[in-house]
């Protein structure tokens, strides 16, 4: 993989997770402050991530991997996503906000697989090359939290709707940038995908490996408190009076 490709993939990862980090951590606080949302409403908003993850295999397995170039699908999704994030920022109530964030997450979650697919397809030695690319996603998430808290101060000034503005702008930027990414055509196949393949059920064979089974179970258990953390931690810290809570959580 040459330096130009490596740079483009790193930028892709940075922007991909910067977008998510802009609004996801502080969404609970935003909903509480802007709409006086109940705990149930906040839970519904964060639940959209799960719905997006459920739908993602159908979009990736049935459509993106077989009929279209991955970078073009990524571009289209992020451009559309930018519009949805903007609508989230101007929504006048939770009942208006929820449909936009639900549709957005159904579109966004598949992009997590798309960016990995685009990256892996350009690599000759993924085990060594991928970590250097993927780490820029983590950096993007961290930078987003620092910008919101310490950079522009939207959290302390209770202007968290601007986090969706910023995410919308960066989403469209990534969408346009995606057209410059290395061409990643669908892998040729003459066979129609089975439902088993679309859902990735063949991957369950990996559970026969005891080490992988332990990893799988551990991941599920870890994600249970993690869901509560993202949903409630920022709101909790803000109610305690912790300054720049999103930045503190990031660090």
Can you say where each PLM-predicted feature lies in the sequence?
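C-terminal membrane-cytosol helix-exit motif in multi-pass small-molecule transporters
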Residues: 148, 166-188
């Amino acid at each position: 993989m040459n330096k130009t490709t490596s740079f483009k993939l790193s930028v892709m990862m940075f922007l991909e997770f910067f977008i998510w980090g802009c609004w996801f951590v502080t969404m609970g606080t935003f909903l509480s402050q802007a709409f006086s949302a109940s705990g149930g409403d906040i839970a519904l908003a964060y639940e959209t991530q799960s719905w997006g993850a459920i739908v993602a295999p159908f979009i990736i397995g049935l459509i993106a991997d077989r009929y279209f170039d991955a970078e073009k699908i990524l571009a289209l999704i992020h451009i559309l996503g930018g519009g949805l994030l903007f609508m989230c920022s101007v929504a006048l109530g939770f009942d208006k906000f929820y449909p936009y964030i639900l549709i957005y997450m159904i579109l966004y979650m598949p992009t997590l697989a798309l960016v990995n697919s685009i990256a892996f397809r350009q690599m000759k030695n993924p085990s060594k090359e991928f970590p250097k690319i993927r780490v820029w996603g983590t950096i993007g998430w961290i930078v987003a939290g620092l910008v919101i808290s310490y950079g522009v101060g939207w959290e302390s000034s209770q202007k968290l709707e601007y986090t969706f503005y910023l995410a919308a702008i960066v989403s469209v930027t990534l969408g346009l940038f995606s057209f410059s990414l290395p061409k990643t055509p669908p892998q040729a196949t003459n066979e129609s995908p089975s439902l088993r393949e679309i859902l990735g059920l063949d991957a369950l064979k990996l559970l026969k490996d005891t080490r992988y089974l332990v990893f799988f179970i551990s991941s599920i258990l870890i994600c249970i408190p993690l869901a509560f953390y993202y949903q409630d931690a920022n709101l909790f810290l803000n109610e305690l009076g912790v300054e720049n809570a999103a930045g503190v959580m990031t660090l």
